[in-house]
């Protein structure tokens, strides 16, 4: 057999092997709804990728410009992991596709010297039409160029997928197909994201699969009025935005241990870990000062405009928001825990193993301080949209980009400082009484 024939034979064998060994897929729940979807398996992140002092750029389209998942991320990083001292800017732009961001990222983003960036494109890139190879090629080429541009400036990248759609968008005159067609197209772009992350050695945040799986689960539980994709089918409300934020925070590799409070009921002593200090333990009341907050979320579980409702669909509390209370040497079967003005009854067994105060107390002694920081974050991010869209790309920016950047930074700095000023230690107390 000559070289040509050996080469052809080898190529045929390789092709056969590729057919026999398809792309490894993520297992999905059983049922007709999920049967058409073939999500490629991504490489999970096994380490914390955030570094102390990181400057995070949150990039995306109108879903990012809603300033909801980006706000959850920034508030979480500010109060839950304060020792990392991560600063955040959001760069969302309504209607944007990956090629559009590529054309503006030098002027709008790289000038601020981010060290890590998240991207969330694909929703507009799929054009609200059934997938075609041309759609995939344009998205893949632009996304790869974005990743490479970030990498050339020393920026670590978390390549985020788009989410899902819940109904056909009424405002898109060129929309074609049906909801399943669109979601299958978004899945193709998600699979491209997986491939890009692997080939470019960057990280991947899977927004699509949690939205697909949990959106369907929520529909079965709460009915058609509950839409994890948002009432317009594209722009999620707080429940869906929490799912998105979880996907990125999880991709960051954060450990989620926000500290432990241990009370020895026999010895009448207490100890803490994390950003919590014992101020005193007198007459059964433990007083603490905490410079590390839990993420506080309220709202009804069956309400898609509720952040806490989003926590029903992803393990946010278990993986990212654990403030643990544990007791030693209990003498009763049950105890009532008073945490400031709030209370809950636990078995001694549960308390001995440790309970998650953040999960069990929607309202708690941190709630007021948390809301102040969160509102300061919202105010800053609102200005960041004005800074980029109206000033950088308005008359001031067209006349003198550098002057526009310098002047807007002077306006932004007090908004950054307000977040720091509002983030103050919280003094709170815990009292445990036998039932």
Language-model segments: residues:
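Short, histidine-centered active-site or binding-site loop motifs used for metal coordination
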Residues: 60, 92, 123-125
């Amino acid at each position: 057999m000559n070289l040509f024939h050996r080469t052809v034979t080898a190529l045929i064998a390789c092709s056969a092997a590729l057919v026999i060994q398809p792309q490894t897929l993520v297992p999905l729940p059983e049922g007709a709804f999920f049967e058409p979807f073939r999500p490629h398996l991504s490489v999970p992140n096994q380490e914390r990728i955030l570094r102390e002092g990181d400057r995070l750029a949150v990039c995306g389209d109108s879903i990012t410009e809603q300033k909801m998942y980006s706000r959850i991320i920034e508030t979480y990083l500010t109060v839950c992991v304060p020792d990392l001292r991560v600063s955040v800017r959001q760069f969302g732009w309504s209607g944007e596709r990956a090629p559009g961001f590529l054309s503006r990222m030098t002027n709008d983003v790289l000038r601020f010297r981010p060290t890590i960036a998240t991207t969330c494109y694909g929703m507009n890139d799929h054009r609200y039409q059934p997938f075609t190879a041309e759609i995939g090629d344009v998205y893949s080429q632009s996304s790869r160029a974005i990743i490479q541009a970030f990498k050339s400036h020393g920026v670590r990248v978390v390549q985020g997928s788009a989410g899902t759609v819940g109904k056909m968008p009424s405002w898109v005159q060129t929309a074609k197909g049906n909801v399943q067609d669109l979601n299958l197209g978004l899945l193709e772009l998600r699979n491209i994201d997986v491939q890009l992350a692997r080939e470019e050695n960057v990280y991947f945040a899977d927004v699509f699969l949690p939205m697909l799986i949990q959106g369907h689960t929520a529909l079965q539980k709460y009915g058609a009025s509950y839409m994890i994709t948002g009432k317009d089918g594209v722009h999620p409300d707080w429940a869906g935005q929490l799912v998105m934020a979880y996907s990125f925070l999880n991709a960051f590799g954060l450990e989620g241990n926000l500290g432990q409070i241990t009370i020895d009921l026999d010895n009448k002593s207490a100890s803490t870990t994390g950003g919590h200090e014992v101020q005193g333990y007198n007459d059964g009341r433990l007083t603490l000062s905490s410079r590390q907050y839990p993420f506080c979320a309220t709202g009804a579980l069956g309400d898609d405009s509720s952040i806490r409702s989003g926590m029903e669909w992803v393990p946010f509390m278990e993986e990212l928001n654990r403030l643990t209370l544990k007791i030693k040497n209990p003498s009763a079967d049950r105890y009532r825990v008073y945490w400031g003005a709030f209370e809950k009854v636990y078995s001694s067994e549960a308390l001995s193993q440790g309970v998650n105060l953040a999960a069990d107390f929607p309202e708690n002694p941190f709630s007021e301080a948390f809301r102040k920081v969160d509102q300061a974050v919202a105010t800053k991010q609102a200005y960041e949209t004005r800074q980029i869209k109206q000033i950088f790309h308005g008359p001031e920016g067209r006349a003198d980009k550098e002057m526009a950047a310098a002047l807007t930074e002077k306006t932004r700095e007090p908004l950054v400082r307000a977040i720091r000023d509002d983030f103050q230690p919280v003094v709170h107390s815990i009292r445990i009484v036998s039932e």
